[in-house]
Amino acid sequence: MMIQDRLFPATGMPDRNWWHVLWPDPDGVIKALRIETGMTVVDLGCGYGYFTAAIARQVGPGRVIGFDLDPKMLEQAQTACEGMMNCNWLPGDAMELSCLLGARADYVLMANTFHGVPDKTALAREVAMALKPDGCFAVVNWHPLPREKTTVLDQPRGPSTGLRMPSEQTRAAVEPAGFKLEALVDLPPYHYGAIFRKTASHEKGEESAA
């Protein structure tokens, strides 16, 4: 069992072969999620770096931080992003992101992991503290389809049906942490991206607490 699976159930990285078939155009996914040139982006739970490399290409002079609990996954991600000078790597628990990150980010992406987080709103609060004012948090989730309907290479893939989150459920978990849903993006064939913007009221609350 991967380290990630022990804390966030059903979130371990899948076999590369079918993952690449499911996501043939990672660069297109990153563009659809409105990640822009020059941003500082955290790939939270980056695994072996499949989306990290695409983010690095998109942000150009910006920076991407691959963040994962499993050092072995980070080693694989570093290999996947070899030669990309705008990549940094940070091992740690996602629930300690803001403390470990130091400087705040423009954007945090969490792809295919949020469904397994035990306290989703607490994690979203941690992400909010790691973001600059007006920063974005994007959650990529499987559509709430029966698992037997989400096949890749003729096999059912993804988390169990009961773990899949409708976009309304994702919104209900994230918005109380100081975010507002900005956009829902369909990511065929089986995913959606929910892009949340950090609210000004949350930023003021952080300043008051400080």
Residue spans of the language-model regions?
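A short glycine-rich, Lys/Arg-flanked "PGG" loop and its adjoining helix->strand segment in the class I
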Residues: 121-136
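A short acidic, Gly/Pro-enriched loop at the edge of an enzyme's catalytic core
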Residues: 99-107
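Short glycine-centered segments of the SAM/dcSAM-binding site in methyltransferase folds
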Residues: 40, 63, 134-136
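C-terminal lobe and adjacent flexible extensions of AdoMet/dcAdoMet transferase-like proteins
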Residues: 194-210
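A short SAM/SAH-binding and catalytic strip from SAM-dependent methyltransferases
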Residues: 106-120
